[in-house]
Amino acid sequence: MNPTTSGSAVSTLEEKNLGRIAQIIGPVLDVVFPLGKMPNIYNALVVKGRDTVGQQINVTCEVQQLLGNNRVRAVAMSATDGLTRGMEVIDTGAALSVPVGGATLGRIFNVLGEPVDNLGPVDTRTTSPIHRSAPAFIQLDTKLSIFETGIKVVDLLAPYRRGGKIGLFGGAGVGKTVLIMELINNIAKAHGGVSVFGGVGERTREGNDLYMEMKESGVINEKNIAESKVALVYGQMNEPPGARMRVGLTALTMAEYFRDVNEQDVLLFIDNIFRFVQAGSEVSALLGRMPSAVGYQPTLSTEMGSLQERITSTKEGSITSIQAVYVPADDLTDPAPATTFAHLDATTVLSRGLAAKGIYPAVDPLDSTSTMLQPRIVGEEHYETAQRVKQTLQRYKELQDIIAILGLDELSEEDRLTVARARKIERFLSQPFFVAEVFTGSPGKYVGLTETIRGFQLILSGELDGLPEQAFYLVGNIDEATAKAMNLEGEKK
């Protein structure tokens, strides 16, 4: 990582390599430069001037193609309203650079690294270009290790890999945001790490809601902004495709600085990775490339790879990425989600059925998967416990139809015991979150992996068969469940 320390991201404006706009097609500009002064691919170009009404214009573009005849084709990072042919264009001589480091925490940025939260300027002495190659093999940390989140259902059944990529699947209103905020909170407390949130092509309202909830839950500290645990980068639905295509790289660049220079563990959230592909598809068509399968860009897997390969563990620190995945028309074979799946180490699937039952986090224990759940990685004890939990829940799922029609009494003794334990497991998979304290009033719990395994082993062994199932609902470790059972017993008397 070689961040530059300069007063401005635009370093060579003094030399002023000037061109002029020759053609504008929506967010794509063709610019003519003097002979021998052609900018490089990915150079940032700046258009400054006034529109026909006299309003100041300041549009940054990125060079995508060199067309010949001293022409380049560039994609705008903001709206091209008011631009006219013949306007002056300045070649900055460098790629887009964004602020990095502690100054970014608690702040909201756009794709260019400009703050958009009305909290004043950001210290831009340390900036970093958004385009760079993935770390070399020799720098990578190849040791497979679990990233403990303190969330029981995740750590036991679909553990995250340190420096891995996790797909987050779930519809609206099943608790994606709260789960994301809890992960941000836990990485800061347990791992001394920070988080970067990249809002890629999603609703502006949701971005605003997330910001407000983060302030309310303390993830962003309003009184002392430097104490915040997260930096936010947004390029939402209303932005041109150039911004939506690059905002993921802006967020990743900020995360890389925390990993490589501060040597921290970083969580990078991308919401939504599908919109990154969608924006690339729009830009590809505007640049005149021949579309590939289902109308996507021919460079789909290259673009995805160049983003995903930068998300990894090095010997300095790690970037663990959690990516919300929108599946168009629920078609998992669509090229966009199919290309994403090739990069994922784990999937966390949120279930509306569990949310309706009031079991939070509403992570589906049977649908969520992880490549880390192997005995040689997590150990025999963890693996065996996870498999037995899944078998018990699977059997309960199979018996539900019989229970619905005939009732519990028609089941065999063994099946009744399985159902009772499965219901306890289901409730024990819920837990109170720190970030939800404000709403629920019950204090949050971080449960270590060994405690989680011990708790489920006790339920499976039958030692806790005598306890009522509500004792297992929204508690931390198993000792709290037994204490809650005693309280319930006392209340009955």
Swiss-Prot record:
Q: What is its main location?
A: plastid
UniProt key word Metal-binding: no
| Sorted UniProt keywords | ATP synthesis, ATP-binding, CF(1), Chloroplast, Hydrogen ion transport, Ion transport, Membrane, Nucleotide-binding, Plastid, Thylakoid, Translocase, Transport
Q: Assembly and interactions? A: F-type ATPases have 2 components, CF(1) - the catalytic core - and CF(0) - the membrane proton channel. CF(1) has five subunits: alpha(3), beta(3), gamma(1), delta(1), epsilon(1). CF(0) has four main subunits: a(1), b(1), b'(1) and c(9-12).
Q: Which GO terms describe its biological process?
A: proton motive force-driven mitochondrial ATP synthesis
Spell out the NCBIfam families in the cross-references: atpD
Q: Where does ATP bind?
A: G170, G171, A172, G173, V174, G175, K176, T177
Taxonomically, the superkingdom here is Eukaryota
* Entry protein name: ATP synthase subunit beta, chloroplastic
Q: Which GO terms describe its cellular component?
A: chloroplast thylakoid membrane; mitochondrion; proton-transporting ATP synthase complex
Q: Name one Pfam family in it.
A: ATP-synt_ab
User: What is this enzyme's class at the first EC digit?
Assistant: translocase
Q: What does it catalyze?
A: ATP + H2O + 4 H(+)(in) = ADP + phosphate + 5 H(+)(out)
Q: Where in the cell is it found?
A: Plastid, Chloroplast thylakoid membrane
Instruction: Give EC number(s), comma-separated.
Output: 7.1.2.2
Q: Entry's InterPro entries?
A: AAA+_ATPase, ATP-synt_VA_C, ATP_synth_F1_bsu, ATPase_a/bsu_AS, ATPase_alpha/beta_chains, ATPase_F1/V1/A1_a/bsu_N, ATPase_F1/V1/A1_a/bsu_N_sf, ATPase_F1/V1/A1_a/bsu_nucl-bd
What does the protein in this record do? Produces ATP from ADP in the presence of a proton gradient across the membrane. The catalytic sites are hosted primarily by the beta subunits.
Give the membrane topology, semicolon-separated if more than one: Peripheral membrane protein
A Gene Ontology molecular-function term? Answer: ATP binding
- Family under the similarity heading: Belongs to the ATPase alpha/beta chains family.
